[in-house]
C-alpha cells in the first residue's frame, strides 16, 4: 500500500482534538509543521483553504538556508522522499513562496518557520535536531518535550515614568524558581514526555503588557525608542534569568543533559526565555497581550458569550485630561484605530496606536529586538488590514528572514470569520468557542 500522507493524519488528530475539549468548551490546539522539501508541501499549504478543515490546527512551513538559497538563485527546489532523501520532484521556489503567501493572506495559515535559525540556539544537539514547536511557535521542541511557560506583567514594573529594574530583577528570579518548581512538580501523560522534560528542564519566561509599559513611559509603539526599550528590557530579563538558573544549579544541580550540551557554565534549565502570545492570561491580568500593540481601545473579545474589554490606561488618561465621555467610549468601541477620532488629542493617539496602525516593518523590528535576547522563540503576529495584498505577506516573510527571526505569522483582518478580535463586533455573527486558533510563530 501507499501512505496517505501527513495531511490525512492531521485530520484524524484534528477530529480527536474536537472531541476532547478543555473543560468541554475550549478547544485544544495543535501545530502542524511540514518541511518545505516534503513532496506533499503543496497539499499542506492548501490544507486550511476550507475554513471548516483543521480548525484545531495552526500550520507552519519549515524552511532553512537550502530553500532560501534556491529562492535567491532562482534554481529549482528539490522535494525529497523523507525516508530516503531521494528527489521525487522539483518546484520553483518563487512559486512556492507565492503560494504560501497567498494562503496566509486568505486564511492566516501557514506561518513560516526558519529551522536553521532555531537550531543555532539548540543547547542539546546531541539529543537531536529540533523540527517542531509548541502550538503558537514560541517554544522549539525536541520529540516528547513540553513547554513550561510564564509571563511577567511589565505594566507592574514601573516607577513613575521609568522601569523599576530592581522590582523586575526580583520578579525574574522568583519566576525562574517558580517555573523550575513547576517542571519538578508537573505530571505528564506518558513516561517519555516526563523523561525528556526532566532531562533538559527547559522553561520559558516571557513578558506581557509591553504596550502598557510603553504608554506609561510615554513612548509610541512605532518610535525608535520602543525598539530600544525592547532591546534593553529583554537583555536584562535574559541576563537575570540565566543568573537565577545558575543559582538554582548550584543549589539543586544542573539539568541532567548538561554534560552533553553546548552550555559552558552549569545551569538548571537548558533554556530560560520565551515570548508567548498570552491571549488568555493577559485578559486575567488585565494587560496588553505579550509584546503586541493593542488591537482596540475598547472591543469585544470573541470568546464564548462575548467579553467586553476597555483599556484602563486610555480611560484614566481621558479622565485626567478632561476628554472622557460615554459618547467617546461608544465612538472608539470596536474600531481598529482611533487616529481619526477628533475628540482624542494627537499625543494620546500616538500612544494608543493599534495593531493595524503599526506598519509591518515596526511589528518585525520589535519582534527582532526581543528575539535577539530570547533563547527559545517569539510568538508574534504581524497584523494587516483587509485591503492588504498578497505581496505584502510575501514581503513580510522575506523581511523576517533578513531580520534573523525564528518564525513569523501574518494575519490579515477578516481572513477567518471566527477571529477573536473583530473589527466591528456588532456586524460579526460567528462567535468562536475559544481563542483564535491561528499561527503565531516567532
For the regions a protein language model found, what residue spans apply to each?
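Glycine- and acidic
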Residues: 1-3, 21, 25-31, 79-86, ...
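Secondary-structure capping and boundary motifs in well-ordered enzyme cores
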Residues: 1-9, 33-37, 59, 92, ...
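Active-site cavity-forming subdomains of large catalytic enzyme subunits
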Residues: 1-154, 158-159, 165, 192, ...
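Structured alpha-helical segments in the cores of large, soluble enzyme domains
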Residues: 6-23, 61-71, 103, 138, ...
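Internal maturation/activation junctions in enzymes
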Residues: 25, 84, 171-194, 198, ...
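Short, glycine-/Ser/Thr-/acidic-enriched flexible segments
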Residues: 39-41, 49-50, 84-85, 110, ...
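Catalytic alpha/beta core of large soluble enzyme barrels
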Residues: 138-140, 179-184, 273-430, 435-442
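Long, charged, mostly alpha-helical binding arms that flank functional sites
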Residues: 144-208, 215, 327, 338-351, ...
